[in-house]
């Protein structure tokens, strides 16, 4: 099924409502591949694949809630043909003609042989079963099933060896105002070739009642198999006899159908025929005039069946509302359960109590809603829908007025200015010149635009004159100057008698050693940094101030734990361990609280924050 296919929700899928109705009529509604397609086809409309289920439910709901299914008569006929125990009208389907009838979609030939044995007959005048037929009274409409029975009798008269020679037939109406016609398509069996030729030979000139049409291949097929016996008089006699017999048979069929109740009641509702077969006792209507009997019969049938239809529609509507309420209640319950699993153990009891209270209130509200009238519920839903649509409309209108329209106006002005740029430049020439003069005389205006080129040129001249300066010499000279200053300071300290001689001597000795190392290695001197322990202490203090570890513990545990944070810093502040060993130990210790993956992620984030501190 296409609904279960792995189709993204934002992709298009093509559906055919007519094929869906066809599946509904033939009880194959679950076969979605018969009315959906992932490729565009003729008669299919595109929708989002995420809306496929809602679209199907909406169409089926319209089918069930309407008084009659919106299925074409041809589909209904096919459904009845698939069920041999059903009645076409009031007469059982014992005749062979009902079995030979096909809907136009199924009658289309699938081979050249079938096309050769197909004739098209245009029925007119008495043979046309529409409103202009001579046998149909005013304001009298023949039902579709009755037309099929009458045409079945008609074909038995005009086709020799009807049962064995005729394969299938179908009927298509052409509405052309007052000159209405019906197209009767006949397909003969391979053994019925002579019957087809005999039918063509007898009735090809009956232009008043019917016209026979065929394509060039069929004409060639008839001419190849046609044998002229030269007996034209007998042909005309048989033809005139056939016309009189046909007209008499048609009149008899109409009278017989008219005597059966419900045949001439207009557009018959097939769904009502399936639901109920209501019989009228005409003995109670003996006092009614004959001209009013037909209308009264219609009203009685409509009234009796309407009550049952309304009751069934109400039951379906009630069932639909109950399903919606149950679905809403289950959704709320699942939402509360999902939220309850995320809550802490300390708040779990309170959540359960509040959930019970909410469930009780929801059940009471549902009971109250069930007592309300269905019409009131529908009106309330309609009002909410209209309010939501009005709110969305106002939001869109406000966005258009405040954002889109001003932006479009600005773009329009800019476009007009660009079209008339030269005119604008000429018109504002005086103002532009004044602006340039003001900026030229402004003390803050940068008049020196080529300072970079000048500096590069001066640097090049300096290098040619003095050469490149080695960084080592500059560093050593600076160290010597610093050493000289320290010696002078030591002399002052000796004179003052302050007890800082050891510290200064040690510092002096360190400076001498550093200068000697720089001379030997010729490397850059880095500024004297703080001791490693002092730097580590500063890093841990900065990490504590940022409270990164606190946030990570709270995020992973769901609750802030002081003991866990203190234990983490206890591991980090061990002086005898390197950062790699600390990280490994932290992962090992945190596996008891978190899982393996969570412990690794926690340690990586802690040391990342420690490096940034």
Curated annotation (Swiss-Prot):
One of its GO terms (cellular component) is cytoplasm. Pfam families: PWI (PF01480). The keyword Nucleus applies. GO terms for molecular function: RNA binding. Keywords: Coiled coil, Cytoplasm, mRNA processing, mRNA splicing, Nucleus, Ribonucleoprotein, RNA-binding, Spliceosome. It comes from the Eukaryota. It is found in: Cytoplasm; Nucleus. Residues 359-375 have a biased composition (Acidic residues). Residues 293-332, 367-443 form a coiled coil. GO terms for biological process: mRNA processing; RNA splicing. The keyword Hydrolase does not apply. Residues 333-384 are annotated as: Disordered. Its main location: cytoplasm. Signal peptide: none annotated. InterPro entries: PWI_dom (IPR002483). Belongs to the SNU71 family. Component of the U1 snRNP particle, which recognizes and binds the 5'-splice site of pre-mRNA. Together with other non-snRNP factors, U1 snRNP forms the spliceosomal commitment complex, that targets pre-mRNA to the splicing pathway. Component of the U1 snRNP particle, a subcomplex of the spliceosome. This is U1 small nuclear ribonucleoprotein component SNU71. It comes from Candida glabrata (strain ATCC 2001 / BCRC 20586 / JCM 3761 / NBRC 0622 / NRRL Y-65 / CBS 138) (Yeast).
């Amino acid at each position: 099924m296409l609904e279960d296919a792995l189709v993204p929700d934002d992709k298009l899928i093509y559906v055919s409502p007519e094929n869906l109705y066809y599946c509904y009529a033939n009880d194959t509604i679950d076969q979605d591949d018969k009315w959906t397609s992932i490729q565009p086809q003729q008669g299919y409309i595109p929708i989002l694949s995420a809306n496929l289920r809602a679209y199907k439910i909406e169409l089926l709901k319209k089918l069930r809630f309407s008084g009659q299914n919106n299925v074409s008569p041809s589909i209904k006929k096919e459904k009845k043909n698939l069920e041999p125990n059903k009645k076409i009208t009031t007469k059982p389907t014992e005749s062979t003609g009902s079995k030979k009838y096909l809907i136009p979609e199924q009658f289309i030939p699938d081979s050249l042989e079938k096309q050769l044995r197909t004739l098209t007959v245009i029925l007119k005048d008495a043979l046309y079963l529409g409103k202009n037929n001579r046998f149909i009274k005013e304001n009298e409409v023949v039902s579709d099933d009755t037309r099929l029975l009458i045409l079945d009798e008609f074909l038995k008269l005009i086709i020799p060896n009807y049962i064995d020679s005729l394969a299938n037939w179908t009927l298509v109406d052409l509405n052309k105002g007052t000159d209405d016609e019906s197209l009767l398509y006949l397909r003969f069996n391979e053994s019925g070739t002579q019957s087809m030729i005999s039918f063509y030979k007898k009735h090809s000139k009956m232009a008043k009642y019917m016209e026979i049409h065929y394509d060039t291949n069929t004409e060639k097929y008839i001419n190849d198999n046609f044998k002229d016996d030269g007996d034209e008089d007998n042909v005309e006699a048989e033809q005139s006899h056939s016309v009189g017999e046909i007209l008499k048979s048609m009149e008899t069929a109409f009278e017989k159908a008219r005597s059966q109740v419900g045949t001439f009641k207009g557009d018959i509702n097939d769904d009502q025929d399936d639901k109920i077969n209501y019989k009228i006792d005409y003995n109670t209507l003996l006092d009614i005039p004959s001209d009013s009997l037909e209308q009264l019969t219609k009203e009685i049938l409509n009234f009796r069946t309407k009550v049952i239809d309304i009751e069934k529609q109400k039951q379906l509507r009630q069932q639909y509302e109950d399903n919606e309420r149950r679905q809403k209640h289950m959704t709320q319950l699942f939402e509360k359960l999902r939220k309850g699993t995320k809550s802490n153990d300390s708040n779990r009891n309170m959540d359960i109590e509040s959930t019970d209270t909410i469930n009780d209130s929801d059940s009471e509200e549902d009971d109250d809603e069930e007592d309300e009238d269905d019409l009131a519920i529908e009106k309330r839903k309609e009002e909410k829908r209209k309010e939501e649509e009005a709110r969305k409309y106002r939001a869109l209108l406000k966005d258009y007025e405040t954002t889109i329209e001003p932006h479009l106006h600005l773009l329009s002005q800019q476009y007009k200015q660009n079209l008339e740029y030269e005119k604008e430049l000429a018109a504002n020439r005086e103002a532009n010149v004044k602006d340039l003069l003001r900026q030229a005389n402004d003390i803050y205006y940068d008049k020196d635009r080529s300072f970079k080129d000048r500096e590069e040129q001066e640097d090049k001249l300096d290098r040619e004159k003095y050469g490149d300066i080695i960084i080592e010499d500059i560093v050593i000279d600076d160290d010597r100057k610093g050493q000289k200053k320290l010696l002078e300071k030591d002399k002052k300290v000796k004179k003052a008698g302050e007890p800082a001689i050891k510290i200064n001597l040690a510092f002096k000795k360190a400076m001498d050693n550093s200068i000697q190392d720089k001379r030997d290695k010729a490397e850059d001197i880095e500024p004297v940094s703080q001791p490693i322990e002092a730097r580590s202490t500063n890093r841990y203090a900065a990490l504590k101030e940022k409270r990164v570890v606190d946030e990570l513990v709270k995020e992973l545990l769901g609750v802030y734990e002081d003991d866990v944070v203190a234990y983490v810093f206890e591991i980090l502040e061990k002086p005898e361990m390197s950062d790699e060993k600390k990280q490994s130990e932290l992962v090992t210790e945190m596996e008891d609280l978190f899982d393996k993956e969570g412990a690794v992620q926690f340690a990586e984030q802690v040391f990342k924050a420690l490096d940034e501190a």
